[in-house]
């Protein structure tokens, strides 16, 4: 999780936003909630797939056949685990953005207007058609597009209309 850099004076001391943070008020977003069925914790601002155990579950994307159902939302009141990590552990309720805007950190450089892709080998981290076409290892997130041109590892904006 990104932390504000307070080593300089003046200017913008905080990041644009944090991965998975909504850019607008909650009432302007359409979200669903599903239970993380996998032992792998789910991060904020990544694509997740429909679970296999029931209609009310989701999981980390591990294969191209795991079709994305939305992007994980960061809740500001999430407690850290014993290791200091803040994410959605197994059996946690995971808020999933279906319609709205959020901040996200791309795994690769992305261009404004490019389709959001889930990078399979990175467990659902986000890329775009700027880095390569959808195909093996690069699954399109339905209705999701980058609103900003963003360098890999920096904060950008995503719009999703599911």
Protein language model features and the residues they cover:
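Surface-exposed, low-hydrophobicity beta-strand/loop segments enriched in small/polar/acidic residues
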Residues: 1-162
